[in-house]
């Protein structure tokens, strides 16, 4: 390479880029060309302002000017000073007026007003006049615009240490707290200056005080003035005595204690005085005295605290445990064991069957479980007994019983195998009522009422009777076993079993098994035994503990065999007898079975009978009593007869206004009297019964104000509670004892007396019905009847009657017709009822009905009240003003309150009425924290209650527990609860809501929701007005307060679904001021705002779950499985089907289906997929390939989509900037850059051209300036690039 010499520029080649740069520079500097370079315009003729003041110059086209009047007039010269406003005045062009700013005056506002002339500064302040205002310079102690305010020098709290500041004029004074002084209480007073501490005590100054340090002085007290008593602090331990000295003390110790303060407890046990392992106990230990485990007797005392005691182990004794004790001396070995004495102990040698330290334990041979095959082991002394199951026997149940093999028992008998003395056998266990080797003999027989059977049995030293029986009778003799001296009787008394042992006819012992009725007709097993002076009664019954009841008692001497009623050495037994009727079986005396053929008397084999009370034979609810072979009906009054079909006839007194009466003659009735009868009447007064002797009444029973009263001579009246004049039948029963009765007299009057005036004292003659009159259970008939006996009992005698009507007959109460306004009358007993037409109601159809006329407009409904109506409706409230009602015209009692509401407000008022009379005249109900709260006349609802702010309807009912009481608890029923909730505290009534001074009742304060029916007592609140032109005639009702706003009728929640808040097509459901969205399958969330993940619950049993756009899922199954959830295995298919191997792969059939041999690069059950699909890079535009279940998937990069990422996304995006405002400058910048780049390229090309290639100087260069100056300059050698 040749050397490069200096660049040589030609005069014409370098001018072009310079010209181009100059051009660009001129274009850039053109907007900033100075205005001076532009030729000036010709000056106007008006520039010199040639016109007079008040006129303005106007140039003309000819180059001259004219002076015209100016709109500024005289203001053109700015005559007004100090910022005043100048306004021209009138036609005179030189006139003007100045409007001064505040603080100046004069024609030209040239005068400054002196604001200090009025002396505004107070308290000697100096006034400084300023423009438009003044300024006060205040003296010390004052401040403010006019020095009007006195400065509070105490505001800066100058007084320290809690001092009090007293403000003055321009000053302050501090009142210091005790212990401080100074102008600002900054000085702490030194109380030690007076040297208050005596006896050399050191004084320490405190705030408002001092403290004396009396250490090492021998003195104490606040000023060290008292001598210290060293013994006062009880320095001596262990109850030692203290001797006081000056600044010293001395302790006198008890024996066993030492030390300066007697604090050392001398250890007497340190020398180990107790031998043979004895425990040494010091007497100075207080824990060893008193208590349950005390070692030393009595209470602890320091006077006896010296010394020790040895607690010796077993086998040793003495003060130091040096003596060996003979443990066998006390005979410790039990149950025949022999004792051997040992050092510090003994050894017992036990008899067989016992063990333990003292042979106290009976060895349980059953612990080894010797009984086989489920046998039960019972321990005995030195042995055991096995209770074997039925199939096994032997000592340890090891022998299988075979006695029943090849043998059968007839009927219902059970074969029981046996094993005795090594031999197998069997016996038949017979069911009850049978006997014999093969249970072929019947032991059951019957005994009828009024007869008995008997037999003889051998006598024995002991006595036992066992039998089974059944009966339905309450009482009767079951069995009697006796000899000439003694008898044992088994009876039923009130259906209860009882055993009686008698001697010489006198009962010696009676045993009873109470509370078990045995007359139920079932079989019962009973046993009674007399053995070793004890009588025992047993009963097998399911009502007994363990199904066995036992009663027993001692007998002085048991019965002995003596000369019996039969042959010598026998007992007589009697079964049945008297009223007993029933059956017996398995009767045994001392184990001897009595068969029916061995008995004498009327013996009926078997136990056959028909249920006499089936079907029920007793009418009118009569009780059927089973008497074994027949029945008896216990009839309710007033029925009687064998089957209760006959009714005792009633007697009607006073029918049609007649005067009725009946009488009976009496004889001796005994000391007691019971009167009973049926009564039916609607009259509140009248004579019922009167016992009299001639004209003197001894006992009178009568009606007074609907109550039954009984009055006798010398006794206070008796009143039966309740009312008896309601027209219903009542059974009346009166009982009198001997102390309540005197001579009743000879006659009984019923319903009246034969002279009506004689009954006025007791309400007059009776009107009504009397039936089944009985005296001491003796029936007194009002009418003769074939049912009555022909002869009267000795206590009574037939009397006479007047104007009685048989049967209980009613008056014709519908004649004349009592029903008004077309009502139909219907007769009831001595009363009537009316069926009214549509527009009338009431007992006699006299009250008008308003609601059929539809006086209320929908949605309100009409509700009838006395003499009128009320329009009730549901109403909607939206935080508006409350609805106000008043009950000033209500006089009836308000028994309670009902209220229905629904809301979602957690804080809202429901109802309120507050008076100045106190808590018992207030009521409020509200929703607090979502629960019901309130105060009802002083009773407070318990909190918290159930949540009610849930948008559902809730119904509240409040009532007093005792309505008539002055103060009572209030009870709350919420939403129809069966059990009320009691409010806390006693409350008054709701009387403050009614009458002339009624307290206004406010509904729905700050309430959003609906109110339903609201009622106080029987008066609903009229939330809706009646139809126009309709007026309710109700005398008592609540009315809306004048000016109370009208309510919005109907219950409507807010428009929560309009517009619908549910996204993505969800359906909005209105839940009353709340909503719920029913989302489609692809969405979820409160507003369907969350895309649902159908794969969240892993629905696919196998394979992978993929979410579909419609919100459902799709399971992509692995090979070999199919179905919506990949649950089902793919069924085998043959090679001859269409769905076999793909791409010509050979197919091989087998028992499990087809098997395809896939070509290279293919895979799958049918060779339907690529073996390694991602190796071919199927994903375009930078997508990522992955394999799932043998199929490839492409995960595309941003901006692409599709199966192979081949689709370019063309979603338009909004421009974040204005296009034109950015594009034009950008284009200009690009153009400029292009020009600069072009220029740079040209220069670079020129440079390359100059520095590369072969250099040939041109003609101009040869004749250039450098050659022309050869004679002057030394030209360097030329260099050229070769």
From Swiss-Prot:
Membrane topology of the entry: Single-pass type I membrane protein
Disulfide bridge positions per record: 75-86, 80-98, 100-109, 116-127, 121-136, 138-147, 154-165, 159-174, 176-185, 192-203, 197-212, 214-224, 231-242, 236-251, 253-262, 269-280, 274-310, 312-321, 328-339, 333-348, 350-359, 366-377, 371-386, 388-397, 404-415, 409-428, 430-439, 583-607, 613-624, 618-633, 635-644, 769-808, 814-825, 819-834, 836-845, 1010-1051, 1057-1068, 1062-1077, 1079-1088, 1095-1105, 1100-1115, 1117-1126, 1135-1147, 1141-1156, 1158-1167, 1174-1185, 1179-1194, 1196-1205
Gene disruption phenotype: Embryonic lethality due impaired gastrulation. Mesoderm formation is disrupted, and cells do not ingress. Instead, a single layer forms, and the embryo fails to properly establish its body plan, leading to embryonic arrest. Conditional deletion in the developing retina leads to progressive disorganization during late retinal development: retina show progressive thinning of the photoreceptor layer and sites of cellular mislocalization. Conditional deletion in the dorsal telencephalon leads to defects in the maintenance of the apical complex.
Keywords, alphabetical: Calcium, Cell membrane, Developmental protein, Disulfide bond, EGF-like domain, Gastrulation, Glycoprotein, Membrane, Repeat, Signal, Transmembrane, Transmembrane helix
Subcellular location, record wording: Apical cell membrane
Entry's Gene Ontology molecular function annotations: aspartic-type endopeptidase inhibitor activity; calcium ion binding; protein-containing complex binding
Gene encoding the protein: Crb2
The EGF-like domain, residue ranges: 71-110, 112-148, 150-186, 188-225, 227-263, 265-322, 324-360, 362-398, 400-440, 609-645, 810-846, 1053-1089, 1091-1127, 1131-1168, 1170-1206
Domain of life of the source: Eukaryota
Any Pfam family matching the protein: hEGF
Organism: Mus musculus (Mouse)
Protein name: Protein crumbs homolog 2
Similarity remark: Belongs to the Crumbs protein family.
CDD domains in UniProt: EGF_CA, LamG
Alphabetical GO biological process terms: circulatory system development; establishment of cell polarity; ingression involved in gastrulation with mouth forming second; maintenance of epithelial cell apical/basal polarity; mesoderm formation; notochord formation; photoreceptor cell maintenance; positive regulation of BMP signaling pathway
């Amino acid at each position: 390479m040749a050397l490069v010499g200096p660049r040589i520029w030609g005069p014409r080649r370098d001018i072009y880029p310079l010209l181009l740069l100059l051009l660009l520079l001129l274009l850039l500097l053109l907007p900033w060309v100075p205005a001076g370079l532009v030729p000036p315009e010709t000056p106007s003729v008006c520039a010199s302002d040639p016109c007079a003041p008040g006129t303005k110059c106007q140039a003309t086209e000819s180059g001259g000017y004219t002076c015209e009047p100016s709109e500024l007039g005289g203001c053109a010269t700015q005559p007004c000073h100090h910022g005043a406003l100048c306004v021209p005045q009138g036609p005179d062009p030189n006139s003007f007026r100045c409007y001064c700013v505040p603080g100046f005056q004069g024609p030209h506002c040239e005068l400054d007003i002196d604001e200090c002339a009025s002396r505004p500064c107070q308290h000697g302040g100096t006034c400084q006049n300023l423009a438009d205002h003044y300024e006060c310079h205040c003296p010390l102690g004052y401040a403010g615009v006019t020095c009007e305010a006195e400065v509070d020098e105490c505001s800066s709290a100058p007084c320290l240490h809690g001092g009090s500041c007293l403000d003055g004029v321009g000053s302050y004074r501090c009142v210091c707290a005790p212990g401080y002084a100074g102008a600002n209480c900054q000085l702490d007073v030194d109380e030690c200056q007076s040297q208050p501490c005596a006896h050399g005590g050191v004084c320490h100054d405190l705030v408002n005080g001092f403290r004396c340090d009396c250490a090492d002085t021998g003195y104490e007290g606040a000023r060290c003035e008292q001598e210290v008593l060293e013994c006062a602090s009880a320095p001596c331990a262990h109850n030692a005595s203290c001797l006081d000295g000056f600044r010293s003390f001395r302790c006198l110790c008890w024996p066993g204690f030492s030390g300066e303060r007697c604090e050392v407890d001398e250890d007497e046990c340190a020398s180990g005085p107790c031998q043979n392992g004895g425990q040494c106990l010091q007497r100075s230990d207080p824990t060893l005295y008193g208590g349950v485990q005390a070692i030393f007797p009595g209470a602890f005392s320091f006077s006896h605290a010296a010394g020790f005691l040895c607690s010796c182990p077993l086998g040793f004794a003495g003060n130091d445990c040096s003596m060996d004790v003979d443990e066998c001396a006390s005979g410790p070995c039990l149950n025949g064991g022999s004792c051997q004495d040992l050092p510090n102990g003994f050894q017992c040698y036990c008899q067989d069957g016992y063990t333990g330290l003292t042979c106290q334990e009976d060895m349980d041979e059953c612990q080894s479980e010797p009984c086989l095959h489920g046998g039960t082991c019972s321990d005995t002394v030195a042995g055991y007994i096995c209770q074997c199951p039925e199939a096994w026997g032997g000592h340890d149940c090891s022998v299988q019983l075979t006695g029943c093999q090849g043998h059968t028992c007839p009927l219902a008998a059970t074969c029981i195998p046996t094993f005795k003395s090594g031999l197998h056998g069997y016996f038949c266990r017979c069911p009850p009522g049978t006997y014999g080797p093969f249970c072929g003999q019947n032991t059951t027989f019957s005994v009828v009422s009024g007869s008995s059977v008997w037999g003889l049995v051998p006598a024995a030293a002991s006595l036992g009777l066992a039998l089974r029986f059944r009966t339905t009778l309450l009482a009767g003799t079951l069995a009697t076993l006796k000899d000439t001296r003694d008898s044992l009787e088994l009876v039923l008394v009130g259906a209860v079993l009882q055993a009686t042992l008698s001697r010489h006819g006198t009962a010696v012992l009676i045993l009873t098994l109470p509370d078990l009725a045995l007359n139920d007709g079932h079989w019962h097993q009973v046993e009674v035994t007399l053995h070793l002076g004890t009588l025992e009664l047993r009963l097998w019954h399911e009502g007994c503990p363990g199904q066995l009841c036992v009663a027993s008692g001692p007998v002085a001497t048991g019965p002995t065999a003596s000369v019996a009623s039969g042959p010598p050495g026998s007992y007589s037994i009697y079964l049945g007898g008297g009223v007993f009727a029933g059956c017996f079986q398995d009767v045994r005396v001392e184990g001897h079975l009595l068969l029916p053929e061995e008995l004498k008397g009327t013996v009926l084999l078997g136990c056959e009978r028909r249920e006499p009370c089936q079907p029920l034979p007793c009418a009118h609810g009569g009780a059927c009593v089973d008497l074994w072979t027949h029945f008896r009906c216990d009839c309710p009054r007033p029925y009687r007869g064998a089957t209760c079909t006959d009714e005792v006839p009633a007697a009607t007194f006073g029918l049609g206004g007649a005067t009725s009466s009946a009488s009976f003659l009496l004889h001796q009735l005994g000391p007691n009297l019971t009167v009973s009868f049926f009564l039916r009447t609607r009259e509140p007064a009248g004579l019922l019964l009167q016992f009299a002797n001639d004209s003197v009444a001894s006992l009178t029973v009568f009606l007074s104000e609907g109550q039954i009263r009984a009055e006798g001579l010398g006794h206070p009246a008796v009143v039966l509670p309740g009312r008896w004049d309601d027209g219903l039948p009542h059974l009346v029963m009166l009982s009198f004892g001997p102390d309540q009765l005197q001579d009743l007299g000879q006659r009984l009057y019923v319903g009246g007396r034969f002279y009506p005036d004689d009954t006025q004292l007791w309400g007059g003659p009776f009107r009504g019905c009397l039936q089944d009159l009985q005296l001491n259970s003796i029936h007194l008939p009002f009418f003769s009847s074939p049912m009555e006996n022909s002869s009267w009992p000795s206590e009574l005698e037939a009397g006479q009657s007047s104007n009685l009507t048989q049967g209980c007959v009613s008056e014709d109460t519908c004649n004349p017709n009592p029903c008004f306004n077309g009502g139909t009358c219907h007769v009831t007993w001595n009363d009537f009822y009316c069926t009214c037409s549509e527009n009338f109601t009431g007992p006699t159809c006299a009250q008008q009905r308003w609601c059929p006329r539809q006086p209320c407009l929908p949605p309100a409904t009409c509700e009838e009240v006395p003499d009128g109506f009320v329009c009730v409706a549901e109403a909607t409230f939206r935080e508006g003003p409350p609805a106000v009602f008043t009950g000033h015209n209500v006089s009836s009692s308000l028994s309670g309150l009902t209220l229905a509401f629904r809301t979602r407000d957690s804080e809202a008022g429901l109802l309120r009425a507050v008076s100045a009379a106190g808590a018992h005249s207030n009521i409020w109900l509200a929703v607090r924290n979502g629960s019901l709260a309130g105060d009802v006349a002083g009773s407070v609802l318990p909190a918290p209650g159930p949540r009610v702010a849930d948008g559902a309807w809730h119904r509240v009912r409040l009532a007093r527990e005792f309505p008539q009481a002055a103060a009572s608890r209030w009870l709350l029923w919420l939403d129809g609860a069966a059990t009320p909730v009691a409010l806390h505290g006693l409350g008054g009534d709701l009387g403050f809501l009614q009458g002339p001074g009624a307290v206004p009742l406010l509904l729905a304060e700050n309430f959003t929701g609906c109110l339903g029916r609201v009622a106080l007592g029987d008066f609903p609140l009229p939330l809706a007005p009646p139809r126009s032109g309709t007026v309710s005639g109700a005398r008592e009702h609540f009315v809306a307060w004048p000016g109370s706003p009208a309510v919005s009728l109907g219950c409507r929640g807010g428009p929560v679904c309009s517009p619908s808040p549910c996204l993505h097509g969800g359906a909005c459901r209105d839940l009353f001021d709340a909503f719920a969205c029913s989302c489609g399958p692809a969405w979820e969330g409160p507003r369907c705002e969350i895309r649902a993940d159908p794969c969240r619950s892993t629905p696919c049993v196998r394979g992978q779950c993929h979410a579909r756009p419609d919100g459902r899922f799709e399971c992509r199954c692995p090979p070999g499985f199919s179905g919506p959830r990949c649950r089902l295995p793919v069924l085998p298919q043959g090679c001859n089907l269409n769905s076999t191997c793909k791409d010509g792969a050979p197919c091989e059939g087998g028992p499990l289906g087809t098997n395809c041999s896939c070509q290279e690069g293919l895979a799958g059950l049918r060779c339907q997929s690529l073996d390694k699909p991602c190796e071919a890079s199927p994903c375009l535009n930078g997508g990522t390939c992955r394999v799932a279940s043998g199929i490839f998937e492409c995960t595309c990069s941003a901006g692409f989509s599709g199966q192979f990422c081949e689709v370019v996304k063309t979603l338009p995006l909004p421009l974040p900037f204005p296009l034109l405002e950015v594009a034009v400058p950008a284009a200009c910048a690009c153009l400029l850059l292009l020009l600069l780049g072009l220029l740079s390229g040209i220069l670079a090309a020129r440079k390359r051209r100059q520095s590369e290639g072969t250099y040939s100087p041109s003609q101009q260069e040869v004749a250039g300036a450098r050659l022309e100056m050869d004679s002057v300059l030394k030209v360097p050698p030329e260099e050229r690039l070769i």
